[in-house]
Amino acid sequence: VVLSKKAMGKAGKRMPAFGKTTDASIAEMNIRDFSINPASGISADKQGKYLGVVESGTKTAKGATSGLDYLKSLGVTHVQIMPMYDYGSVNETGDLSYNADGAQNWGYDPENYNVPEGSYSSNPSNPSSRVTEMKQMVKGLHKNNIRVIMDVVYNHVHNAANHSFNKTVPGYYFRYDDNGSLVNDSGCGNDTASERAMMRKYIVDSVTYWAKNYNIDGFRFDLMGLIDTKTMQEVRAALDKIDPSIIVLGEGWDMNSTMDKSEMTIQPNAYQVASDGTNNGIAFFNDSIRDGLKGSVFSDLSLIHI
């Protein structure tokens, strides 16, 4: 499919530089969960969709503020949106109604990293709909002074055997063990090989594409610990050329991995991706603080959820 720039719509202008990452107040959101409920007051044709996120003036049947107005009332500076690139677990042209079987997934099963998810568009069969409507959503949030952090999952794909990576260069884009089996440190059946030149370039080009063409204000890296520090350094450098205040943060869990510990983007290696004084560096979700407050997520019971 070839789309003209006119057909894809305009992204508008970037928001002004934000400041320090530590000044951000971030709410996490799934597009469908946020707007699918029939009682939300959001227009029926926009429920569960990109455009439902930015419909204003909505209230529930009981008169409570909902949708965009509710999000604004939280006073957040950023909304971190769960994966909104194309993912594999939902049939985009199937039944997407409220409570429909198989219509909901958080999207941590990537297919096409650089294509918006079609199930969030008004017409998944029309390629331009998902592009223009995602841009409208981002512009609508920006208009209301809310910046957008995109949740990205470059550490694994939905199905390695059928993925375009393996069809392009079989065996190159993924990690394999000594027995020739796919490495599964992610727990998702396959791990991408960020340390290889073209996978690294793909990741850097991808975030650059989203930042330039959709004016994305930040990126949250899923299982960032499985991505090497050199790749993350290049991600930061590429985004700095667009806007040094773009937020980059991620899950720097110290996981079992075939990678050398010194190369993993984990908290002990945070100094390798820290701010150089001209940018925001790369931030980490801190499981050490979490576990200090509530105990280990794997072995301790707690009434606290963090």
Regions from the language model: what does each represent?
Residues 8-11, 210, 253:
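Tryptophan-centered motif/residue detector
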Residues 101, 108, 223-304:
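Active-site-proximal helices and loops of the catalytic beta/alpha 8
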Residues 218-219:
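Active-site capping/gating regions of soluble enzymes
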Residues 27, 150, 250:
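Active-site flanking residues adjacent to catalytic metal/cofactor-binding acidic residues
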Residues 32-62, 66-214, 232-243, 247, ...:
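Substrate-binding/active-site clefts of carbohydrate-active enzymes
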Residues 1-28, 34-48:
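The feature marks proteins involved in alpha-glucan
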Residues 8, 304-305:
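Extended hydrophobic/Leu-rich segments
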